[in-house]
Every structure is written in C-alpha cells, then in structure tokens.
Curated annotation (Swiss-Prot):
Its main location: membrane. Residues 22-25, 82-105, 155-157, 217-225 are extracellular. The gene is hop. CDD domains: 7tm_Halorhodopsin. The chain crosses the membrane at residues 26-51, 58-81, 106-127, 131-154, 158-180, 193-216, 226-254. Belongs to the archaeal/bacterial/fungal opsin family. SUPFAM superfamilies: Family A G protein-coupled receptor-like (SSF81321). This is Halorhodopsin. SMART domains: Bac_rhodopsin (SM01021). It is found in: Cell membrane. One of its GO terms (cellular component) is plasma membrane.
Amino acid sequence: MTAASTTATTMLQATQSDVLQEIQSNFLLNSSIWVNIALAGVVILLFVAMGRDIESPRAKLIWVATMLVPLVSISSYAGLASGLTVGFLQMPPGHALAGQEVLSPWGRYLTWTFSTPMILLALGLLADTDIASLFTAITMDIGMCVTGLAAALITSSHLLRWVFYGISCAFFVAVLYVLLVQWPADAEAAGTSEIFGTLKILTVVLWLGYPILWALGSEGVALLSVGVTSWGYSGLDILAKYVFAFLLLRWVAANEGAVSGSGMSIGSGGAAPADD
C-alpha cells in the first residue's frame, strides 16, 4: 500500500474528533459556522420580541414559520461546528480533485431541507395561496435539497454527481415557477403584493447563488476552496434567511390587518368562497 493510499484510508476513517480538529484548523470554515450560530441566536431573541403582540391566526402562522428558520439553522450549524454532520469524501475519477479527500460539510443540506420549506410556507401564507400550490412548492423544494445532498455525497461516479445536480436544478425551476408565476397573482388578490414582490425577488436572487456555489466549489469543479465556499453559503444563509425573515416579520407586525385571515384556503388561491 502506498503512502498516498494509506493517508486516504486514514482520512476516510477519521473520527468526529479528527473532523472537528480539521474544522477548527480551517479559519474560514470555522468562522463561517460560528458567525452563523451567533447571528441565529440573536435573531431568535429578536423574533420572539417582534412577534409577542401578534394575534391573528394567519399572522401567527407566518411568525411561527419565520421563527423556525433561525431555530433550524442554529441546530444544524451546531451540528457542523461539532463535526457531527461533516465528513471526508474521496472524489471520484473525472473530478478536479479525483482521488483526494475533501472535507464535506454535508449537514448544510439538512439546514436547507428543513428551513427553506419554512421560508416558502411564510411566503405562501403572505400571498394567501391555496394549499395545493403551497404543497407543490414545498415538496419541490424538499426534492431540490435531497437530490442536492445526493449530488454532494456520491463518490462512485463523477457523472452521477452532475446528474443529481441537474435533477436538483429541475426541482428548483419548479419552485421558481411557483414563486414568479403563480403566487404573485395570489398576493395581488390578498393585498400583500408590494411586500411579497420584494421578498420574492430577494429569495429568487439569493437562492440562485446556491447552485452556482455548488458548481464552483469543491463539490463541483473545485475552483473555490472549502472555506471560501462555506463562507459563500453562510453569507447567502444570512441574507436569504435572517434578513428575509426580519423584513417579513417586521411588515407583518406593522400590517397585521392585511394578514388577519385564518390561513390557507383549499382550491383557488386566497379568494373567499362565493355566497350561495
């Protein structure tokens, strides 16, 4: 067995303590995780204070959805910081780092799988869309995150990594269709089109950054280091989650009357049923 293969085997069998040591030795990676944990803690306290006077059922649902975003994030980032959801992967032949062991913070996909549906739930409630449309957006989003995780973890085939990346992007296109085509009309009918439009653009622009980072980072063509990629993801998370949720919750707290309905309708957007 060569020295290179011995090193590779050792890294693949690395313990959580070994992974934690590797994280802590990488300043960019380590700082990108802890900054997010600190911000999530502050945001949780802020959102509790902002939502204390909200009373209407629909507004409360929006508040709960926005609260879950930093709650999920702080839990998931703590998993990254501990090394629990980070591991070494040997890149397959054809990859730019073929044969090398790459540190993979795959726990980010858990963050996105549980937090991004809450963002869509909050947006759907704001637009007062119908349950079928909301279900479509959330399930497509979960599919996007799960297939993205598969793309990141596959080590048997370089081609299959990109196949799953393409499938993930296809799910993303479905989410974009709902956000850009279906929900704006619902928001217009609900009287929330102005704030919905702002949050829609913020979400779409920032979410487009994730597949770009994947492609440029060590999971894709490896033009960016693990630490730089991690900071890119953390920066996007801060804007797409905490800033988004703050803008939404601030608007809801100040305009609760505009979202005073009881919640989702079944069938045709937020339109009220016709009288007999």
